[in-house]
Amino acid sequence: MSTENHKAYAIKQKDIDYNEKDLLMVQAQLINCNSKGHVLVEKVSKDAGTYSAGKYYIPGVAMKFGEHPEEAGLRVLTEELEIDDREIALVGTQSHWNDVKNHWYLLYLFETVQPISQEEIDNPCEGIDELLYLNLEDATEENSTQGLRDICEAMKIPGKTYI
């Protein structure tokens, strides 16, 4: 007989409640690097009213129930960044555990085959103050989301699972 600690369960939420305990989040993230190895990030608008307001965030979306990871990756471009659709390639997966909220994050990491143009970077959509390439070593608790810092740490040790 399994104890509660050994049981797995899933909750399908129409609207994600990020305050829910024991939450499993499956996300698609866009990891585009420039020639210096800096990663494309968005700076979320200061008035966004979310935990990420005013901070750097790696563009990403929560996957819809039953959605293919590549479709979610394309939504990062068209819905999150509101830029032209283009071919993407899966470059990795990551798993992160958040002790504070008891959340488990499973991430599909994509990059665009065709680079995002400077014109697209210079014209961020509503809700994003700025798109830029950031040296992830410059990410701090004050200027970036925990998710960005988790991804940065995982990129240092490819293949390591963080749960």
Language-model segments: residues:
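Unchanged
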Residues: 61-86, 95-147
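A conserved beta-turn-beta hairpin within the catalytic core of GNAT-like acetyltransferases
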Residues: 48-54
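Acidic, metal-coordinating catalytic segment for phosphate/diphosphate chemistry
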Residues: 2-29
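Hydrophobic "anchor" residues
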Residues: 38-39
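Charged phosphate-binding loop/patch that engages nucleotide di/tri-phosphates or the phosphate backbone
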Residues: 149-163
